[in-house]
Amino acid sequence: MDARHNHPNVIMIFPDQWRGDCLSYLGNPDVETPNLDALCYEGVVFEKCYSPVPTCIAARACMITGMDPDSTGRHGYRDGVPWNYPVTLMTQFRDAGYQTINSGKTHFFPDRANLGFEVNHLYAHEMHAQKFDPDFRCDFHDYLRKETGGEVRDTVDEMSSNGWYTKVWPHAEHLHPSAWTTSMAIESIEKRDPTRPFFLNVGYHRPHPPY
């Protein structure tokens, strides 16, 4: 079977901890989401979908394996536990002839675990990754170091990853992790293997708390 002619390209936009009702399309008065609204108008909106587990890592494991928490072995926020899943959403796409690409956050462990991604432009939150390896740098850190002349922090002082206090991003907007994730996703599409369809995961760290 020629995958180029029988399978459409697939892009999965995967934000972190985005409330299901935070779309202006759904009538939320406090947020403006014109680009996501456009996708809603052109596609299908599922308003009665629920996560099998309410915590980040465990929900991600269910999402990419198609299994429930009992089967994945993750019922809560169990960080630092290796992801040993031989069959994932990405391996299924890869085995079907797709080029599998990630741009942004995955929150796997180890952070560089690909789990079926052939191309991985990785963002890993600085405070998370360096808990396990003080010298760890993801692709975004390398980019930020180059652009800022050595500064690699991707957050601001005194701002917790799960707190309520916020501060202004200290760098230019194009250096923000969300902007980098989008840029790498676009670059991945432009440089993809033209002989194969592609599956692209676009993993945004935001609007994860405190935002």
Functional labels for PLM-detected ranges:
Residues 1-211:
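Formylglycine-dependent sulfatase
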